[in-house]
């Protein structure tokens, strides 16, 4: 409490000394266009492109990803392009080793020539089933040269989902790694269309024998490279048009089989061109690429970084190495998802809690001062520089010390975590918003906007309108304009591959209906406030937005993951929780009890501690009584894509969680009744 009052006092004095400088908060970020539609509010565009939406870079004649590939390599030549860490003879990873833009283009040329030698025709589907690696990117870029359509797989998907995608997309040739080779062969057992498999690594005799029995031809990546070199450029390029299908992005799907989002060269090129209006990528930038390449957000970021000549360091694949690699690379751009940033915040405060009392007091005072200045919109340039130097510079080194922009995407970033990143990382923090159907880039906060909690205006490649959701009280023409976010423009997909029914359901009159509830703010920016599909009614008629509750519950030091569950025949919600392993261990140590997480999750005393902490946080955040979980079940097993409780992009599979914990849910409600 003393720290807070001290911070408030310093804030007032500092505000006077700083001549009441306010943080940048630009107004007029969007403009309304056209007449008011029959259904919903006025259409809004980014104020920078009121007259037109961007679909290409006319000055540079960039109309497709093929144009971007060729012209970027010509422009940046011998500059560093992609870097990765190689293992030595002892299996230890070394420093990042780099190839130039010229070398990258040369390898892309060899691969596409090699595929032509195999008889692969333009516009054929090419599957990629591997974790992040340089060869993945080379195959992806090589596909532009012959207008191939790339279909990527999350490495952790099961054979059933992989087989569905392979058959549905009619993939006759697929690339894989040594780790995924056996699973790829398993797919070929049941999917006869898959006839050729190319492994990025060496292949043992056993796998050659299995392939022979299946009637599948196996090659190594090096063999295709060799064929491409020997072809000596005899196969002419077959460049795509803007409307050529570039990729089919199969959404992982929280229910039912994956949907194949059709994404053209125009869709992706328009997003890449529009990115420069938000992040301002330079040829001096360095990007650390660790989100899966099957994730549309990471794909777009790489395409943009490549287009503007940045250097891109590739994740080695071991999660425990991420912070080591970040320090080695010292990126200027750090793109992540809320789960990563929440974990960074938890770890920082855990380390601070171990410091001596005096240091904790000083740090908390400095943190609260900067937090309050951001929260209330004051800018204290001199004082903030001193605080950054004395208190936060070492924390910033955790991300290499040179990060100038942090971008969070995939899911909403909580207010506290966004401010935390602004305070301790001493850089610009942006929230982006995007769906696979919108190529992952549909809205983003501007670099010159220092407010918190918005996703900014639309990209210059799409426009947005809100549609009424009367059953939930959302009015797109009300005093506060709210409604379902709908997208339209050059970057938006035309629909789902071979699925007209789903396309008609979610793409109406040219607009993609996201299922997200948005709110237009006074400055013209957009905020995501709810999820239409994850809102349900309790027995007393109250509506509950589960993601809003989960954002608050996960702030508890004891909670690693949470799924809020409710039933229309019940009057309250409950929570399925995977507790934070370290917090479990620390609590058990303090009570001198069994430290096995399975036993701790059954311990009624610990369950009460966790529930009490959750209730405290919920009340502090202003939740209504019906929104606060009345009972919890602790599970020692994390939600993951391996147990089918998470999608590969870290979204909860609520239907599967409900089935998986059906007995536990019944027991919790029976105790409450």
UniProtKB/Swiss-Prot annotation:
Provide an example Pfam family for this protein: AMP-binding
Glycosylation is annotated at 267
Signal peptide region? 1-18
Upregulation details from the record are: Down-regulated by Pseudomonas aeruginosa, PAO1 strain and PA14 strain infection.
User: Which InterPro entries does the record associate with it?
Assistant: AMP-binding_CS (IPR020845), AMP-dep_synth/lig_dom (IPR000873), ANL_N_sf (IPR042099), LC-FACS_euk (IPR045311)
Listed under catalytic activity are: a long-chain fatty acid + ATP + CoA = a long-chain fatty acyl-CoA + AMP + diphosphate
Q: What's the Enzyme Commission number for this chain?
A: 6.2.1.3
Q: What is its main location?
A: endoplasmic reticulum
GO-annotated cellular components:
endoplasmic reticulum; endoplasmic reticulum membrane; membrane; peroxisomal membrane
Its GO biological process annotations read: long-chain fatty acid metabolic process; positive regulation of phagocytosis
Where would you find this protein in the cell?
Endoplasmic reticulum
Example of a GO MF term? long-chain fatty acid-CoA ligase activity
Presence of keyword Transcription: no
Provide this UniProt record's keywords sorted from A to Z: ATP-binding, Endoplasmic reticulum, Fatty acid metabolism, Glycoprotein, Ligase, Lipid metabolism, Nucleotide-binding, Signal
- Family named by the database record: Belongs to the ATP-dependent AMP-binding enzyme family.
> What is the protein's known function?
Long chain fatty acid acyl-CoA synthetases catalyze the formation of a thiester bond between a free fatty acid and coenzyme A during fatty acid metabolic process.
What is this protein called in UniProt? Fatty acyl-CoA synthetase B
Q: From which source organism is this entry? A: Dictyostelium discoideum (Social amoeba)
Q: Provide the organism lineage as a comma list.
A: Eukaryota, Amoebozoa, Evosea, Eumycetozoa, Dictyostelia
From the UniProt record, report the name of the gene that encodes this protein. Answer: fcsB
């Amino acid at each position: 409490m003393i720290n807070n009052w001290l911070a408030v006092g310093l804030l007032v004095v500092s505000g006077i000394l700083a001549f009441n400088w306010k943080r940048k908060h630009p107004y007029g970020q969007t403009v309304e266009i056209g007449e008011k539609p029959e259904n919903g509010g006025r259409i809004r565009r980014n104020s920078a492109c009121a007259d037109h939406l961007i679909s290409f870079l006319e000055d540079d004649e960039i109309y497709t990803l093929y144009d971007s590939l060729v012209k970027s390599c010509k422009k940046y030549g011998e500059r560093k392009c992609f870097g990765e860490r190689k293992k030595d003879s002892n299996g230890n990873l070394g420093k990042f080793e780099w190839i130039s833009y010229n070398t990258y283009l040369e390898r892309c040329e060899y691969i596409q020539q090699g595929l032509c030698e195999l008889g692969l025709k333009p516009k054929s589907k090419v599957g990629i089933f591997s974790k992040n690696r340089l060869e993945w990117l080379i195959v992806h870029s090589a596909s532009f040269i012959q207008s191939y359509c790339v279909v990527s797989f999350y490495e952790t998907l099961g054979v059933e989902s992989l087989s569905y995608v392979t058959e549905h997309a009619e993939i006759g040739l697929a690339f894989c790694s040594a780790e995924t080779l056996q699973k790829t062969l398993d797919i070929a057992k049941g999917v006869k269309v898959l006839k050729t498999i190319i492994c990025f690594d060496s292949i043992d005799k056993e796998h050659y024998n299995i392939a022979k029995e299946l009637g599948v031809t196996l090659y190594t990546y090096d063999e295709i490279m060799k064929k491409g070199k020997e072809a000596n450029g005899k196969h002419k390029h077959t460049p795509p048009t803007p409307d050529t299908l570039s990729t089919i992005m199969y959404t992982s799907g929280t229910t039912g089989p994956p949907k194949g989002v059709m994404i053209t060269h125009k869709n992706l090129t328009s997003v890449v061109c529009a990115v420069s209006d938000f992040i301002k990528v330079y040829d001096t930038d360095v990007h650390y690429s660790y989100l899966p390449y099957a994730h549309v957000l990471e794909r777009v970021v790489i395409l943009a970084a490549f287009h503007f000549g940045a250097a891109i360091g590739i994740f080695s694949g071991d999660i425990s190495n991420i912070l080591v690699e970040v320090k080695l690379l010292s990126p200027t751009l750090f793109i992540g998802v809320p789960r990563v940033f929440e974990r960074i915040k938890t770890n920082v405060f855990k380390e601070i809690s171990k410091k001596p009392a005096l240091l904790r007091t000083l740090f908390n005072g400095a943190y609260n001062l900067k937090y309050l200045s951001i929260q209330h919109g004051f800018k204290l340039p001199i004082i903030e520089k001193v605080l950054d130097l004395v208190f936060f510079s070492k924390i910033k080194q955790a991300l290499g010390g040179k990060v100038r922009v942090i971008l969070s995407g995939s899911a909403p970033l909580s207010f506290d975590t966004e401010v935390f990143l602004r305070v301790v990382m001493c850089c610009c923090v942006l929230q982006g918003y995007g769906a696979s159907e919108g190529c992952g880039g549909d809205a983003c906060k501007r670099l010159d906007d220092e407010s918190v909690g918005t996703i900014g205006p639309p990209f210059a490649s799409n426009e947005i309108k809100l549609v009424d959701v009367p059953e939930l009280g959302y009015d797109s023409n009300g005093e506060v304009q709210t409604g379902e976010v709908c997208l339209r423009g050059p970057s938006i997909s035309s629909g789902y591959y071979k699925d007209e029914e789903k396309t008609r359901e979610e793409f109406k009159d040219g607009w993609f209906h996201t299922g997200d509830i948005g709110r237009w703010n006074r400055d013209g920016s957009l905020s995501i406030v709810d999820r239409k599909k994850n809102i349900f009614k309790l027995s007393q008629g109250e509506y509950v937005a589960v993601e809003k509750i989960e954002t608050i519950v996960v702030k508890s030091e004891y909670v690693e993951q949470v799924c809020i569950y409710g039933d229309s025949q019940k009057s309250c919600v409950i929570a399925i929780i995977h507790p934070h392993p370290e917090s479990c261990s620390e609590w058990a140590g303090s009570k001198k009890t069994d430290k096995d997480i399975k036993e701790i999750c059954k311990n009624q005393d610990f369950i009460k501690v966790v529930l009490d902490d959750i209730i405290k946080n919920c009340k502090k955040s202003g939740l209504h009584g019906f929104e606060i979980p009345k009972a919890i079940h602790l599970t020692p097993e994390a939600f993951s894509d391996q147990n089918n409780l998470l999608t590969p992009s870290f979204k909860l599979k609520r239907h599967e969680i409900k089935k998986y914990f059906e007995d536990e849910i019944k027991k919790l409600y029976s105790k409450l009744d």
